[in-house]
């Protein structure tokens, strides 16, 4: 199924993807999702926050269901598997169950959460954060992309109703359990399929380094107030201090004003991604780097530990050759973490990534491992929903 969408939002020069939320590529992917649901006779709809749902069964009659799926948006120049693998595998797992004549005792849904990556508006997992009430709807509406368009304006242009954004208890009540399949984003998984134990705490911060614009040639060094130097020191310190604290820190995005080759900048704005196994160490790192800059926390996701009973059960069901699937933590953020923090029983399946490359065109998973992921997911869905042939 991934072949159906492999050209949507793809850069023909690099092979990477640009699938920003609510872009033309995203709208095309939404149509693909709805079409896949209709092909299978699933009842699909878009909730008030832009998340997509496709139901096998009726949760309003049968009670809360088991939801699987992921997201379809990407980071800039992202890979083909991060997100779409989970959505495609969810549809294929349903196909596998139906092919075996399986009839679940509770509803099953495929979900596609909007703007998981946060590439356009700067906040990750916007759809699931709004759904669960973690993200204030007024703040969400005011978020702006690089062109200055607010989320409110973008949603209105797409025919949505931004005034309806916010916690959606009606939709949440339909979700009894959530199981997200995702490509592993490192090299820690040696088996074809694994299970997540926890998600590291992580956040994004905007650093504003201020200076004074001036001529690059005529301004003596002793007369300069150059914010680029402060930024450069922060980049080096981020690496040094992160290693000392045992965490990860990355300045991956930067904006310079006025951005002239022959002028000292007046402002350097950079975005820091920091994450690690312990909250205190991540926050200590950010505090140490904050000297000389105005720092704004744009998002924060606390540590998530997945339900031990559920993850153990999932590992046993998803294992191959009679052995439980390996259980491992992840440093990557996911919608599964947002739902788990909101009290939804949640588990994650990982599909092996042989290179460990992610958020880049080189992201990859072997076809046979993807098949193993579908088989494992189908087994988990069958186990958690009961029913039979």
Where are these regions (language model features)?
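A generic, well-ordered mixed alpha/beta core segment in the N-terminal half of proteins
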Residues: 76-147
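A short beta-alpha structural unit
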Residues: 18-22, 250-260, 270-277, 294-311, ...
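His/Asp/Glu-rich mid-to-C-terminal helical/loop segments that flank catalytic regions of hydrolases
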Residues: 215, 219-244, 351-389
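A non-catalytic alpha/beta surface segment that caps or lines the substrate-entry region
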Residues: 10-57
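Midchain, well-structured core segments that form catalytic/ion-binding scaffolds
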Residues: 115-116, 122-280
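Zn-dependent metallopeptidase/amidohydrolase metal-coordination segment
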Residues: 4-6, 69-70, 325-375, 379, ...
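Active-site-adjacent substrate-binding region
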Residues: 7-8, 149-197, 235-239, 300-352
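N-terminal capping segment at the start of a domain
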Residues: 1-23, 114, 140, 297, ...
């Amino acid at each position: 199924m991934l072949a159906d969408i492999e050209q949507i939002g793809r850069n023909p020069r690099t092979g990477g993807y640009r699938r920003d939320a609510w872009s033309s590529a995203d709208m095309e992917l939404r149509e693909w999702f709805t079409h896949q649901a209709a092909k299978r006779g699933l009842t699909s709809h878009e909730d008030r926050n832009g998340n997509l749902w496709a139901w096998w069964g009726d949760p309003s009659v049968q009670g809360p269901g088991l939801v699987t799926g992921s997201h379809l948006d990407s980071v800039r120049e992202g890979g083909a598997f991060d997100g779409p693998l989970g959505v495609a595998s969810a549809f294929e797992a349903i196909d596998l169950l139906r092919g075996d004549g399986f009839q679940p005792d509770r509803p099953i849904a495929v979900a596609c959460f909007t703007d998981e990556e946060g590439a356009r508006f700067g906040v990750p997992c916007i759809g699931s954060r709004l759904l669960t009430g973690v993200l204030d709807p007024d703040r969400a509406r005011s978020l702006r992309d690089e062109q200055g368009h607010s989320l409110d304006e973008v949603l209105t242009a797409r025919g949505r109703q931004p005034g309806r954004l916010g916690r959606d208890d009606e939709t949440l009540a339909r979700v009894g359990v959530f199981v997200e399949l995702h490509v592993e984003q490192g090299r820690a998984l040696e088996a074809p399929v694994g299970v997540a134990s926890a998600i590291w705490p992580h956040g994004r911060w905007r650093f504003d380094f201020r200076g004074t614009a001036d001529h690059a040639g005529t301004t003596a060094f002793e007369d300069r107030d150059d914010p680029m130097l402060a930024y450069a020191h922060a980049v080096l310190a981020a690496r040094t201090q992160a290693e000392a604290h045992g965490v990860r820190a990355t300045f991956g995005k930067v904006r310079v004003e006025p951005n002239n080759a022959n002028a000292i900048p007046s402002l350097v704005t950079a975005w820091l991604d920091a994450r690690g196994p312990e909250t205190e160490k991540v926050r200590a790192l950010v505090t140490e780097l904050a000297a000389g800059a105005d720092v704004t926390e744009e998002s924060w996701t606390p540590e998530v530990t997945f339900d031990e009973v559920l993850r153990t059960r999932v590992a046993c069901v998803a294992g191959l050759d009679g052995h439980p699937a390996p259980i491992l933590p992840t440093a990557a953020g996911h919608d599964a973490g947002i739902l788990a923090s909101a009290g939804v029983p949640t588990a994650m399946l990982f599909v092996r990534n042989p290179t460990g490359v992610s958020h880049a065109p080189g992201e990859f998973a072997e076809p046979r491992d993807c098949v193993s992921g579908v088989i494992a997911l189908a087994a988990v869905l069958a186990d958690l929903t009961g029913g039979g042939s």
